[in-house]
Amino acid sequence: MNTLQKGFTLIELMIVIAIVGILAAVALPAYQDYTARAQVSEAILLAEGQKSAVTEYYLNHGKWPENNTSAGVASPPSDIKGKYVKEVEVKNGVVTATMLSSGVNNEIKGKKLSLWARRENGSVKWFCGQPVTRTDDDTVADAKDGKEIDTKHLPSTCRDNFDAK
């Protein structure tokens, strides 16, 4: 006697569930990295908005601005903020963006990135990367304090070392 089979067998369903689980295991980390990179891009965008004011101050005064007020940008630094960015601070000509400690990807909570410039052949050349501090008009030093954004979350245009030239 022939019976008509309808639906899927238990083995077929288990195989499909296993495949979906494997795909999710691969896709989830990629999605997490994508969201972190998107959130970091907001920090870069806000920090880059301060470059022209810092450059103008340097070209007019021959030294880097000490803080947000002298650079002519919003002060206190917490006035420059975004959905994922806590503040953007100008300190001795280094523009540092700090991510929020909640509401952002876990891997970038409270982390920082910096934009800094050097005088080069009569113009000002900007760099972007991990947090730095300016030691004098021409030198910056690595400011590693455990608050660096993992390089994989930085765009390729923002991976300069503190000693970049």
From Swiss-Prot:
BP terms from Gene Ontology: cell adhesion
Transmembrane regions: 8-28
Residues linked to a glycan: 70
Residue list for modification Phosphoserine: 75
UniProt subcellular location: Fimbrium; Membrane
GO terms under cellular component: membrane; pilus
General function of this protein: Major component of the type IV pilus (T4P) that plays a role in cellular adherence, microcolony formation, resistance to neutrophil mediated killing, twitching motility as well as transformation. Mediates the attachment and the formation of bacterial microcolonies on host epithelial cells. Mechanistically, pili retractation induces host NF-kappa-B activation in infected cells, which is temporally associated with the formation of gonococcal microcolonies.
Designated name of the protein: Type IV major pilin protein PilE1
Organism, scientific name: Neisseria gonorrhoeae
Taxon lineage: Bacteria, Pseudomonadati, Pseudomonadota, Betaproteobacteria, Neisseriales
Gene designation per UniProt: pilE1
